[in-house]
A protein has these predicted regions:
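Conserved NTP-donor binding/palm subdomain of two-metal-ion nucleotidyltransferases/polymerases, i.e.
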Residues: 1-113, 119-263
Length: 264
């Protein structure tokens, strides 16, 4: 492994483990490349301590502050949207986002993008779409076989956010047995969401075993179409560590065997 990547991974590891013994001294000739690598993978907060007293520090500190601000903005958008749905009798399941960020030592350091919600009942999905559009959520046309995309703009701030409203947890596979297994696992009759409290608000989320199976498929889809970076791997590892005792690994292996992807 190149020294640059070795140093980068040391920063990631020490930050996620809260290892204060790691000195994090960065050779001057690596500073520009390491800063660019962290920016590319949206992991600037994890390497920030190593750039103290360098010319890169002010800009990287500002990016870290922006990322933390974005976390609370997404948190507010998530709460706003889920509250709207639940107050109108529409159950939904929070995927990824602040739910996964809660597994990090510092949740605000996990880069957040759009909001992903899963509604697995067709009638509830239809009701949600009518409600959202009536409340100012604008549908954005997108080719997708598993979600509908909406943009919502807060009038007071002018800040807009994207909502991906999922009717399937992941996109369709060409291999039909895989689609059948995924549909069965996350069907209304089989799936039993659990509750997770984040920043004082309680959401419905996937149970640990189903969550891990979902993350495997999510990573596989990224790998097949565009590849995935270290953030997805960090999500996976931190979630496993947090919920290890609650995950039925034998069941996950069984599901993978059913779809002919046990090698995943």
């Amino acid at each position: 492994m190149q020294p640059l990547y070795d140093h980068y991974l040391q920063f990631i590891r020490s930050s996620l483990k809260n290892d204060t013994s790691f000195s994090g001294a960065i050779p001057e000739e690596e500073q520009a490349s390491l800063a660019a690598l962290a920016e590319e993978h949206r992991t600037v907060p994890f390497v920030l301590p190593g750039f103290r007293n360098t010319s890169f520090y002010p800009a990287m500190l500002q990016k870290t502050k922006n990322m933390m601000l974005n976390y609370y903005q997404i948190d507010a958008f998530t709460r706003h949207t889920v509250s709207l749905l639940e107050e109108n009798g529409i159950p939904c399941i929070l995927l990824k986002g602040i739910s996964l960020a809660a597994c990090y030592p510092v949740p605000e350091y996990r880069k957040l993008g759009d909001l992903d919600l899963y509604i697995n009942e067709p009638k509830a999905l239809e009701k949600a779409q009518v409600l959202l559009e009536a409340q100012g959520y604008k549908e954005e046309k997108e080719l997708s076989d598993h979600h509908v995309t909406y943009r919502y703009t807060f009038q007071k701030t002018g800040r807009s956010f994207l909502l991906e409203l999922h009717y399937r947890v992941v996109g369709m596979y060409q291999y039909e047995p895989a689609n059948q297994t995924v549909d069965e696992v996350y069907s209304p009759l089989r799936l039993k969401p659990i509750r997770q409290t984040i920043n004082g608000f309680t959401y419905s989320v996937l149970p640990p075993t189903e969550y891990v199976f979902y993350m495997i498929h999510h990573m596989l889809k990224h790998y097949l179409y565009s590849g995935f970076g270290i953030r997805l791997l960090c999500d996976f590892v931190l979630y496993l560590k947090r919920y290890e005792k609650e995950i039925d690994f034998s069941r996950i292996h069984q599901w993978c065997e059913e779809i002919g992807r046990a090698h995943v």
